[in-house]
């Protein structure tokens, strides 16, 4: 039996599922109002995000280091924008606040599945 066919089929199914998750994440990013403060396209301004100095999701950002305050006005720590940090930022937005940003994000009423879909979408934006 040729083992390559099942492996290719599994890879294809995984890609389709990943694309579906990104699409769902984009829909949630908009419907949960993330797009009001987090800019994702240079050509689409985000006045609320500019006023709050919210992190932008454009360019090469995923996996990069950033400085955050531990809590509101707390000590500075360097973190990496990875899955753990991103999910924590949605669940507990005041736990780590990007240096220079204003603490304004309210915790989002989301399920774990929704948070992971939003993360998949945001991660897909990084170049």
Question: Each PLM stretch: what is its role?
Answer:
Residues 13-30, 45, 79-80:
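Electrostatic cytochrome c docking/interface patches
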Residues 25, 31-41, 47, 118-122:
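The canonical Cys-X-X-Cys-His
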Residues 29, 61-62, 90, 94, ...:
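Hydrophobic aliphatic residues
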Residues 84, 96, 103-127:
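C-terminal capping alpha-helices of c-type cytochrome domains
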Residues 21-25, 33, 82, 86, ...:
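Stable alpha-helical elements in mature extracytoplasmic
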Residues 26, 41-89, 104-110:
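Gly/Gly-Pro-rich "capping" loops immediately C-terminal to redox-active cysteine motifs
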Residues 4-14:
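Bacterial N-terminal signal peptides
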